[in-house]
Amino acid sequence: MDPKNKTDKEWKESLSPEAYNILRKKGTDPPGTGKYYHHDERGNYYCAGCGNLLFEFNTKYESGSGWPSFWKPVEESNIETQTDNSLSRLRTEVLCANCGGHLGHVFEDGPKPTGLRYCINSSALQFKNISNKEK
């Protein structure tokens, strides 16, 4: 089944309450609380909703923002962006291209070589270390 065709009920049944709030309701993890914020294992980060590969460990960096930050996705085609004008300010929302789940936001204040900071909610992610053991 195409994840974009899942019903809200199906999402609610298949996700943890935290992941459902972030991915389907566009929520936000409280700053500094996510399990991947201070996380430095070698591996890859996947969408918690559908398993789409999103980020590699070697693009993660400490931004001081309170959320896991990456300077680029594995493939641009694995994410989508759209304008978000909630909270009375203009931002760029980052979505999983496979399931449409809300991941976080991207800002233009990141490190070289991209100058981008993908600020991603831990609850929207699933980590697998290099040996493919799920964490």
Where are these regions (language model features)?
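A short Gly-Trp-Pro
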Residues: 2-135
